[in-house]
Amino acid sequence: EMTSSLVGSEMCIRDRGKWIFNKLASKPVFINTVNPEVRTKVAYNLLREYGYFNGATSYEVEPDPKNPKKAKISYKVEMNNAYTYDSIAYVRLRHRIDTLVQRNIGDRLLRDGDNFNVVQLEAERQRISSLLRNNGYYYFRPEFISYQADTIMNPGKVALRISTKPGLPRTVLRPWKIGDISVFLNGYNNEPPTDSIRYKDMTIFYEGKLRIRPKVLYDRLKFRPGDLYSQQQQEKT
């Protein structure tokens, strides 16, 4: 009976792409747990995420002539040529943000001639966000970066434009500096602070008896009032 048959899967890969084989090939399983249409769609989406916009996927169920309770599903993936970047531009960035991005352009993760790659696009978002957050832009997040990819002008090529999303609030687009510095020390059993002490430009809130010298805490701070906010320095602290 078909619902209790075992099915194995294999893939016919044309051109390149062992990585997609590793994602989709599987050991024999009951056929009622296999959904080849979904797996074929997954393969198709993977191709597009890695720049193979002209790729195609299909499958075929092949019964075992020696055992009617066994079958094999063959997946065929035709990758064709990947789309590559023929131009990458950072556009419509505010002056200070544009200056930061251009000053660190050597660290970018996207290069002319590279294959289109969704994973790298997301990594570049993270890089730009970290760069800005380490230079005062406290409220900036990766999702505020927008991409526009044009594949019409040159067949097989992608003209990529990178910008900040329109309509972002001013709080996101301006750098912030460190103001008052407060350190909160809970008790041994996580009791909330009940007292405070001022040391230079730092306020320490503590519970019970202060068990550490203020200078020790102060010297561990990687920033001072008036410094531009830096996520990296905050994490080091």
Q: Across the structure, where does each feature detected by a protein language model lie?
A:
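Extracytoplasmic
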Residues: 31, 38, 42, 52, ...
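Acidic, glycine-rich low-complexity/disordered segments
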Residues: 80-115, 125, 129, 138-237
